[in-house]
Amino acid sequence: VKVTFKVEKGSDPKKLVLDIKYTRPGDTLAEVELRQHGSEEWEPLTKKGNLWEVKSSKPLTGPFNFRFMSKGGMRNVFDEVIPTAFKIGTTYTPEE
């Protein structure tokens, strides 16, 4: 399963807007959560159209970890995928 995370316009230090590509035939993402660096808590991302987004009242602290569950029941965690100093338009691919 290949997953990529592209940082989209609208992202800023307190908000992350992502185009997440999940390539598994016949399956789609059901839930995506983010854990900030140094945090124990997973925060849910909200799906808006084809994009996923998370907002915070304080600046987000990377590198960011992601956890997902697909509609087909696949679960996975990706550590330190996107750095704090992310660039809009950049696609980040987790290491296998």
UniProtKB/Swiss-Prot annotation:
Domain Expansin-like CBD: 14-94
Family annotation (PROSITE patterns): EXPANSIN_CBD (PS50843)
Subcellular localization, as worded in the UniProt entry: Secreted
Keywords annotated in UniProt: Allergen, Secreted
InterPro entries in the cross-refs: Allergen_Lolp2, Expansin_CBD, Expansin_CBD_sf
Coiled coil: none
One cellular component term from this protein's GO annotations in UniProt: extracellular region
Superkingdom as given in the UniProt entry: Eukaryota
Record has Membrane as a keyword: no
TM stretches of this protein: none
Entries under Pfam families matching the protein: Expansin_C (PF01357)
Any Gene Ontology biological process: plant-type cell wall loosening
Recorded family membership: Belongs to the expansin family. Expansin B subfamily.
Name the UniProt record assigns to this protein: Pollen allergen Dac g 3
